[in-house]
Every structure is written in C-alpha cells, then in structure tokens.
A protein has these predicted regions:
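Short, compositionally stereotyped local motifs that mark structural "simplifiers"
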Residues: 1-130, 135-150, 468-481, 485-565, ...
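Short, well-structured beta-strand segments within conserved domains
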Residues: 38-50, 527, 567, 596, ...
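An acidic-aromatic loop/edge-strand motif
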Residues: 61-62, 86, 676, 684-744, ...
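Middle-to-C-terminal accessory/interaction subdomains
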Residues: 75-82, 90-126, 131-132, 157, ...
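Conserved ATP-binding subdomain of kinase catalytic cores across diverse folds
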Residues: 103, 110, 114, 119-285
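Surface-exposed loop and adjacent secondary-structure segments within mature catalytic domains
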Residues: 167, 183-184, 249-301, 307-308, ...
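Activation on beta-sandwich/Ig-like modules and their edge loops
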Residues: 554-559, 563, 570-572, 578, ...
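Surface-exposed, low-complexity/disordered Ser/Thr/Gly/Pro/Asn-rich loops and linkers
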Residues: 587-636
Length: 847
C-alpha cells in the first residue's frame, strides 16, 4: 500500500545506470538513464544494470513492487469476484498470503505471435527465453532472492491450457549457474539448477467445467505422502505468480527429478545419472540399465534367482512404496488398466506421468521411483463420477513401472514383502492412516484457502476445452465442497479400499497380523507388552533382536512353454471343422495334424504400418486375413516323471493376445478373455488395444493343475480376431510352474504365550503363522526404555571437519574420499541409556 521512493546504486565510481519499468532488459543503449531516486506509486518491476566505458557491464538486477489495489483492478481480474461482497475485502490479504514469484522479460519473447506462450508446443533449448526470476515472501523481507534465468513452457496436455506450467533454468548464459536460497525449508537442498512452476493441471479450473473438484493441492499433498513413507520426493510450495507485473494466479513452485535433482539429493554428479520418464523417454544419461530392468520383468519373476537379479536394479522398499502410494492416490492419468465395480474404466491405455532415476556411472545406485504429475487423482475423475473405489492393483503397461509391478506381484516372496510395506503404512499411525492424511490435507488446503479467492478472480471463468463460463468458479461454491469431499470421503475410505483390492491379487494376506500393545512407546522404566491376533488356529512368532521371525523359502520355476517353444497352427474352414470338430483341443492329435503349420511360439500377422506386433511374431499366418477371424493353436510339452509332476505347486498361463482367446489344457477349458463362441469362425467378443496386447497377461491355473499328467500334455488355444479383415492378429502363450521350499521359523523367533517384559530398548517384529502354513504381514514396533536426552546428560564432544586426504593402507581400504572421514561425536554423560529418538539436527549440518 502507499508508495515507494526507490534509488539504484553501483559501487563502481563514475559508472552509469540504465533501468526499465516495462519488463524489458536494459543495456548500455536501451533504458532510462538513472539520475536519482524516483517515485513508485503503482505496481512496477524495475530492471537495472550498470556500465562504464572500458569495463564489462554488470548483469541485470530486478526488483518488483506490487500494490494490491492495482492487482485487483487489472483487466484480467473478474469483477464478479473483485466486487463481490463475499470476497472483495479478503482479496487484498489473499494476495499477501503466499510467497511471490515475479518473472520479468521482453514482452514479445513470451507473448504474442512469436512468443513461447503462443507457440506452446515448442520444446528444447531453442524454445527457452531469457527472463529475470524473483522470489520473495511478503511476510518476511529477508526471504527473497532474484537471478537471471531461462524460461520454457512445460508439460504435455497442459501446454494447451490457458494457465500453462513453466520451467525455469539457471545458467551461466544468464547469470549464476544455480539459484542459491532456502526456498523449501523442509528440504536439505538449498541450491537449484532449475525449478518448475505448475499451474495445477487437472487439479485446477482451467481444463473444463467438469473440473469442479479442483483443490490445487493434490500434487503437493502426494509428494508429502511419499516423503512420509520414507522416500525421496520433490519438494514444493504454493506461490502467487506475476508475469511482467500481471497477476498470473496460484502456482506450485517445486523441484523436478532430473539429473541435477538426483545428484543434489542422492550424490554424485549430474553426468552420473540416468533419468527415464513415461514413454521411456531418456531425459539424461542412458536407457541401458532401464532396458535391462524391463527385460528382467518381462521375462517374469519365477524363481529366487530371478528375484535376486531384479534387485540389482530395484530397491524393493522404494519401488513397493511408490506403487502403494500411486495406487492409493487413484491417479487416472498414470498406468492402466484400472477397474471400478469389475469394469475396466481406464482413461488411457498408454503409460503416463512417471519418473525414475539411477546413478549408473562413478558408482551406482538402484532406481528411484518418483511421484510425478499426480494431480488427476483422489476423486479428480476423467468421467463425471467421484469415487474412492478405483482399483489399480492390476496395472501392467509394457516397458513401464507397471510391468515391473505385474511381474513382481505374482512372486510369493514379493507378495509378503509388499504386504509388510502395507502394514507399515496403513496401520499404527503410518503415512496412509487417517490421522496423518487428514492433518496434511488440512494443512495444504488451509495454505491456499484465501489465495484461491485471487485464483477465482483471475481464472474462474476460463477453460481450455470450452468457451468462458458465464459465472466464475468460486472458493465457497466449488473449492470448499471439493476439498471437503476428499477430507470426509476419500481419506477415511481409500486405505481400507486398497487393502481389500490388494487381498484380491495376493498382495495382502487374510491371515491377520499381530496387534502389539502398547505400540511404540517411550518409557523410562520397564514395560509389559502383549500381542494378539484375530486369526484362529495360529501362532504368533516374534523376535526382539530386529530380525524377521520368518526365514524365506526358495522357489524354482519350470518353464513348460516358453518363447522358443514349438507350436502347430491351422486356420479352420468348414471342411476342416467337419473333419476334426473339437478333437483338436485334446491330447490325442487331430486327424489332419500333418496339414497344420509348424513354427515357433508367437503366431500372427501384421498389415498395419505401425508394425506393433512384428517383433512378437515368429510364425506368420497371413492367409488368415480376409478368410477367418479364428485360428487353432496346439503346444505340446512333456512332464518326464511322477516326481516332477508332484513337485509342481503352481501353474500360470501368460498370454499376449489380439483380440481374444480360449485356452484348453488336455482338453479342458481353463481360461479365456474376450472370447466369442466355440464356433470355428467365431470373432472375439471385444477388441484388445495394441499396447495391451503385447504385454503378457497372467492367468492363474493352479486350481487346474490336476489336469497335468506324466508324459505328453497339450495346451490348445482358440485365438480370435474382431473380424476376418482386422489389420493384425497375435497369439503367444507361456506356461510356467513353480516349486517352492517352504519358509521356516527363524531360530531367533519366540512363540508368544503371554505378556513379556521389556527392560531394554529395541524392536519387536512379529508375524502370525497359521497351522496350515500361511504367514501374516509383519508388525514392527520400536520401544525406548531410556531416560530422555537433555543438556544434563548429552554433550557434543568432538567435531572432525574437513579432514586430510586418506593416506594409510587401512584408510585407503575403507574409502579414498576424505569427506567419508568427517564425524560428529556425541557423549552420554549419565550412567544410563538415554533416548535420542525425538531429537534431530536442525542446523549446522549439510550433506
């Protein structure tokens, strides 16, 4: 409010200063020559530089001044809000509630016919334009920073929205190569190579009128959930954005997980990192490690050896938590398929909106999986139906995190590991329990409660897919009901819903995990702990040494039909049908078997220019086109003896298919999908998307394992197309069986028979084991039996900072990096154990 008298100075004697007030960049030839302090009485961005003959000119500095009265009266602000008796008095304060990001620039480089806003599909370095970045908090004058930078339009679909996301790059070309400021107080990183301004995407009002459910906070909230699960996730905060002084709305200022982010958070140099995102697009480094990981997944996880191999690339905790968090979020703009009430309602069939990073050079890490662009979630539906019941537990997109999840979720050891992570996060105050979820949701929504009023004035009527609305969306009519629905419906119900969904795919057992009482307490004196389970005919086993009471068994896999297996195929016609009828399905060969085509697994044809199936087809049936929509296939395989047969305890059929099939094992129908009828010329009941067809879909045939016999067995497939003139066709089958050595009770495990006394600090880990051999998920609880730490019993006694290079043989064996020898020593001066669990270093340490 009021006015400012502003002066500009330089330390260089006799230097001249030029400045601008319209966002343009001053030069020694362009701009107002500074001759003394001047008055600023309206919203203004001052850009200034100093120059002197014979010397290098300074870079350009910028300082923005905003008057709330000016902002409210800008031409883009809707008078239905600015003059509203409900909102007009709140608007001035709403504009001060958040930090400000002000971007100043040559107007025609961003807007107008040649500007990047108009040409929003342009990408890459060539689309980057020079700007000046300012960040400041109206409530804290010391919390400010500014730096020359580059600007690009960001995103996919959201590039077309009227309120576009923006990427900011800090480079030597413009000023300093990194921005140095404590922008995100809860982040250990204080310098940034680039930042992202997200406009809200589908969680904003600028998509179309169906988006009444917008909250503007879903993305940040879900990053917070991933961090509270113990994983790394980009930090961010909400800001008010101004472009050349024009209020541009409520944005999220955040990190994004490129190579610089990963180096900052996980170590190494940016050049060491591979960054791969949706569509397998390589943002940095190489895709070699990602391809190796995907190849392992697409080959299937069928044995202990396979499970160990995939863990060379995967941190299972990070991966499982990422899948749990994203599935919990019910993100309709991510992976597929997903279901509601048993019906596939997938919005997209291609994979979208994921980011992974791996350090592959100068030392390696495993892949980190990041929550990314997750705002079309938590009741933001592409359909008009808000629900907390979407089921993403069967995602399987090819060459994406979905196929990794799909392969792992069929392996028994991962099933129980995944259940352990669910137990950790969905119970006992974990990240996906109602208390933390609701607290975080309320914190984020309260942060933007007033700023949403300004957003309503700026963007309440504009949308991408339609003409402007006649009445603006408002906080009280649209935003409040939307955020309250999440608070009162989605959050209380979603965790229970996903647990039920995961039970259906064997990722959470029906055996009830032990309840430990009390759970995770701090006490200065010994305490009594009890356990119970609701599962009958079971025993609780627990340990007090931090180990798992269960020892995993080993699993081996028998490939009955693989990618190089032989196959016989025929395209039936009326004469063939009259001769063989249904006998082709049985073990006994049909009478015309010598007329069948002999080949290798992977049967089909491809007439489309896309060529999607060519790499999967080994045996071509071009004669099928325009002749028949059906094909018959026979795979023969051997089980050598009774011992082998009796060792098989599971049976899984995997199918690539376009468009439908029915499978017969030794003449018995065991599985089908999109199957029309058994007629020799039947078409499929529905089509299969090409992207889905190339992904193996699993069908559990364990209940039909008794159909197997010693000697020759036959898997017969009736493959079906949508029509005889379909442009492509594909059938590929794989059949595997596994033999598992049972898991064991750990030698250090104790069976629970009654309350136990704890007199020392430690971790109790407990599982329920049923009499039939089924284990529960793991319940884990830490107990501190110690005095609280305070200034009377805890001292910092030694700091080893900036040590010399490692030189002795012993030192060089441990590490050649001298930073590894830095340490801080704490001393307990009491005679008893003290509890440090509630303490952390908030200042003075950086990594």
């Amino acid at each position: 409010e009021g006015f400012f008298v502003t002066g500009i100075s330089t330390r260089t004697a006799d230097a001249s200063i030029r400045y601008t007030l319209n966002g343009t960049k001053p030069t020694p030839e362009k701009g107002i020559i500074y001759d003394g302090p001047f008055l600023i009485a309206s919203s203004t961005t001052v850009r200034a530089m100093a120059y002197k003959e014979g010397m290098v000119s300074t870079n350009v500095d910028a300082q923005s001044y905003f008057f709330t009265g000016d902002i409210i009266n800008q031409s883009e602000m809707n008078p239905g809000i600015t003059n509203s008796p409900t909102y007009r008095d709140e608007l001035r304060e709403a504009l001060k509630k958040l930090p400000v990001v002000s971007l100043s620039f040559e107007q025609n480089t961003i807007f107008g016919r040649s500007g990047i806003y108009e040409n929003s599909d342009d990408k890459g370095r060539g689309s980057e334009r020079e700007i000046h970045f300012e960040y400041f908090d109206p409530a804290n004058p010391d919390d400010s920073v500014h730096e020359p930078a580059g600007l690009r339009i960001h995103g996919g679909n959201s590039r077309q929205h009227p309120k576009k996301p923006l990427r900011i790059y800090f480079r030597d070309d413009y000023g300093d190569s990194r921005l140095e400021h404590d922008i995100f107080p809860d982040s250990p990183v204080k310098t940034f190579k680039s930042l992202l301004l997200r406009g809200g995407g589908h969680d904003a009002w600028t998509f179309d009128s169906r988006w009444r459910e917008a909250s503007f906070v879903r993305n940040q909230f879900l990053h917070q959930v991933q961090r509270e699960m113990g994983q790394t996730s980009p930090h961010g905060r909400h800001v008010n954005v101004f472009l050349n002084g024009q209020y541009w709305g409520l944005y999220e200022l955040q990190e994004f997980p490129h190579e610089h982010y990963n180096a900052d958070h996980h170590g190494g140099d940016p050049e060491d990192w591979d960054i791969v995102k949706h569509g397998q697009e390589v943002e940095a480094g190489s895709r070699a490690a990602w391809d190796a990981l995907i190849d392992l997944a697409e080959s299937g996880i069928n044995s202990s050896k396979d499970y160990a191999a995939i863990q060379e690339y995967l941190d299972l905790e990070n991966f499982a938590d990422a899948m749990i968090q994203r599935i919990w979020a019910s993100d309709e703009d991510w992976l597929s398929p997903f279901f509601l009430n048993g019906r596939d309602i997938s919005t997209f069939s291609d994979d979208k909106n994921w980011y992974v990073g791996r350090k592959s050079r100068n030392g390696t890490t495993k892949f980190f999986f990041y929550n990314w662009d997750a705002e079309m979630s938590m009741g933001i539906p592409f359909s008009d139906l808000q629900t907390f019941e979407n089921d993403f537990s069967r995602i399987n997109n090819a060459r994406s995190p979905g196929i990794i999840y799909d392969a792992l979720r069929r392996y028994p050891e991962f099933q129980l590991f995944f259940a352990d992570r669910l137990r950790k996060h969905c119970f006992f105050g974990g990240a996906l329990t109602l208390g933390p979820l609701r607290e975080n949701w309320i914190d984020y929504t309260e942060t933007v409660r007033s700023p949403v009023v300004a957003e309503s004035a700026r963007w309440g009527v504009q949308a991408w897919l339609e003409q402007d609305r006649f009445f603006p969306f408002t906080r009280d009519d649209e935003w409040l009901p939307a955020v309250n629905w999440v608070r009162d419906q989605f959050l209380p119900n979603r965790t229970r819903e996903i647990l039920n969904q995961f039970r259906q795919v064997n990722l959470y057992p029906n055996t009830e995990a032990p309840l430990i009482l009390p759970f995770g307490v701090n006490s200065e004196t010994p305490i009594e702990v009890s356990m119970n389970t609701g599962t009958n005919n079971s025993t609780i086993y627990f340990t007090k040494d931090g180990s798992d009471p269960r020892i995993a068994g080993l699993t081996s896999t028998t490939i009955l039909i693989g990618e190089n297996s032989n196959v016989r195929v025929i395209i039936p016609d009326a004469l063939i049908n009259n001769e063989i009828g249904f006998t082709w399905r049985s073990i006994k060969p049909p009478s015309n078997l010598n007329n069948w085509i002999s080949g290798t697994n992977g049967v089909g044809y491809e007439r489309s220019s896309r060529g999607t199936y060519l790499s999967f087809i080994s045996t071509t049936v071009d004669e099928m086109w325009d002749t028949n929509a059906s094909a018959y296939l026979r795979y023969e395989f051997e089980i050598p003896d009774l011992k082998t047969l009796q060792s098989l305890d599971s049976l899984v059929l995997q199918m690539r298919y376009d468009d439908g099939f029915a499978a017969y094992l030794n003449g018995t129908l065991v599985s089908w999908s999109n199957y029309g009828t058994s007629a020799w010329n039947s078409t499929s009941s529905s089509p299969t998307n090409d992207n889905e067809a190339v992904v193996f879909e699993g069908f559990d045939l364990t209940p039909q394992i008794s159909q197997l016999q010693v000697g020759t067995n036959v898997l017969a497939i009736h493959g079906q197309n949508t029509s005889p003139r379909s442009s492509d066709f594909l059938i590929e089958a794989a059949l595997t069986s596994s033999s598992s050595a049972p898991s064991k009770i750990s030698p250090s495990a104790l069976s629970y028979s009654g309350p136990i006394e704890l007199n020392t600090s430690g971790v109790i880990k407990a599982r329920t084991l049923t009499d039939s051999g089924q284990w529960s998920a793991l319940t884990e609880s830490y107990f501190s039996i110690a005095s609280p730490a305070d200034a009377g019993n805890l001292l910092v006694t030694e700091i080893h900072y900036h040590p010399a290079d490692a030189s002795t043989a012993g030192e060089l064996t441990i590490s050649t990096n001298k930073d590894d020898y830095e340490f801080l020593e704490l001393l307990n001066t009491s005679g008893n154990e003290i509890d440090l669990s509630d303490y952390n270093f908030t200042r003075g340490l950086a990594f």
